[in-house]
């Protein structure tokens, strides 16, 4: 079972994401603030991260940068920030995907599945070489 960390300060959104992901058999942990989320992300192993950008404490850009400096795990940013500059910055810091709010929870699950499948293939290939 793949483990996913959601770092999202809006509890209703985090719970919606969690519910849809758990229905698809993912194990989900939620952190509702940036500092706790960053510590959780760096101290524990997850198969994928879902980050909000506008968080109390440490923002999603900083969390993305910190995760990417240590891990190659897939990162999906989900934010109300719709400007191209925010998307470009997030992707430039190492996010693998960027979704804007409001979003379709089913689409989020589909993107999670796609990123995890690709990441698992890359890991498998790296072990065979």
Predicted regions mapped to residue ranges:
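N-terminal/domain-start alpha-helical segments
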Residues: 1-123
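Conserved small/polar residues in nucleotide/adenosyl-binding loops
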Residues: 128-129
């Amino acid at each position: 079972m793949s483990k996913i960390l959601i770092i999202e300060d809006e509890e209703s959104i985090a719970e919606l994401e969690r519910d849809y992901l758990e229905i698809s058999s993912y194990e989900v942990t939620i952190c509702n603030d940036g500092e706790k989320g960053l510590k959780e992300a760096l101290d524990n192993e997850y198969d994928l991260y879902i980050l909000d950008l506008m968080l109390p404490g440490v923002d999603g850009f900083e969390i993305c940068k910190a995760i990417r400096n240590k891990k190659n795990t897939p990162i999906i940013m989900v934010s109300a920030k719709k400007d191209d500059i925010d998307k470009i910055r997030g992707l430039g810091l190492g996010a693998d995907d960027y979704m804007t709010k409001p979003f379709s929870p089913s689409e989020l699950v589909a993107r999670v599945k796609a990123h995890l499948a690709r990441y698992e293939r890359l890991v498998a290939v790296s072990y065979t070489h």
